[in-house]
Amino acid sequence: MSNEDISKSLKNIETSVHDDFIKFAQKLVQTKSLTCQEREVAFLVEEKMKDLGYDEVTVDSVGNVLGRIGNGAKILMFDSHMDTVTVNNLNEWEHDPFGAAIENGRIYGRGACDMKCALAASVYGGYIAKEIGIPDDVTVLVSASCMEEDYDGEAVRLMLKERNLRPDAVIICEPTSLKIATGHRGRTSIEINVKGTPCHASNPNNGVNPVYLMTDIIRNIMKLSDDLDYQDGQDNGSVALTNIYCNTASNNSVPNDATIVLDRRLANGESEESISLEMNRLLEGTEGSWKFMDIPGKSWTETDFMFHSFLPAWNISSDHSLVKGAISAFKEIKEQDPVLYQMGASTNAVVTAGLLHIPTIIFGPGNMEQAHATDEYCDIQMMVDAALMYADICHNFS
């Protein structure tokens, strides 16, 4: 079958299910699914995959939905997360955040861009791939994962561990405007604590104020931030102080201790060991102690987990076969060259590529500027194009 025939077949298959595809995307947006509260969306995805004839559909102990097509040794996985951030400014929205209104060729609503339209595209992309055919030696997995917004990559890590899976390649379907992201920075959350000696605030000299002791550390953080900014190259790390709080008996007491939280974005090559050395230098000569944050959580299935917040940076060569496959699919559908770039945001790729070193790209519909935005939306044609491109990648995967 020629490339032209393949493209025509892909589009004909999509046309036959187009209305159902759009309605499914709308239904996903209409269904609330905050982090660790994705139950109803998980049921929708599971039911849709079964209706579309996936070879196997399962839900793991954490609540991730995984659909399988084919049974070959080579595994290509698509991943989209089901959860969204909340809506805390309802009066500023022109569209109902959970109405999934269609206007000007766009679906509006919370999660439309980040990333329920991408999820719909991956589910229907899998169906189209099954209809047109995939190589006998290939398995396509379509993952609808949980709790990405608060626990980047943890659900995917647990899913792969529980199922003893190691895909040969992964496509994270986060919004890239169908540009191909070949890497992004990692991140870690670091907690710094300083102990004090509490006393009544009317006699502050009877105690030791930990907030005052923290000021030298904060100055060191500001200097570290400047030093990272001044490094040569575009792939720099960064550091930001994002929270500060005290453990105090009352507002008329000197606190017992003070804590700050750092968001440390990681460049390629930065490891737990190198960041540990950096933090030790930062606190040298001060009263502070530090640790990488381990954050407990409970999934929608009531499964407890502990999220270790060190997520490495990653990249992939533009010469890799996965990247070339995405480039070819884009050209097939859009008849033009795609854009390759380094993404600014963090995604589940911190686990697939950063921790597990599985070849990964980020490639999905929607403009990242719309993620978490008021009147969030995704372009319908871009969503359809994504499904066609995903199917094309599956058809040609080797």
Name each model feature, range by range:
Residues 2-88, 257-261, 275, 380-384:
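N-terminal helical capping/dimerization or prosegment-like subdomains
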Residues 2-4, 16, 191-398:
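Metal-dependent amide/peptide-bond hydrolase catalytic core
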Residues 115-185, 189, 398:
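Acidic/histidine-rich catalytic neighborhood of metal-dependent amide-processing enzymes
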Residues 69-71, 80, 185, 196, ...:
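A generic beta-sheet turn/junction motif
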Residues 87-103, 167, 182-193, 328-329:
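Acidic-glycine-rich active-site phosphate/pyrophosphate-binding loop
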Residues 75-141, 380:
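Active-site metal-coordination/substrate-binding segment of hydrolases
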Residues 76-78, 143, 171, 190, ...:
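Hydrophobic/aromatic beta-strand patches that form the interior of the parallel beta-sheet core
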Residues 57, 67, 100-102, 241-244:
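A structural signal for short hydrophobic beta-strand segments in well-ordered beta-sheet cores
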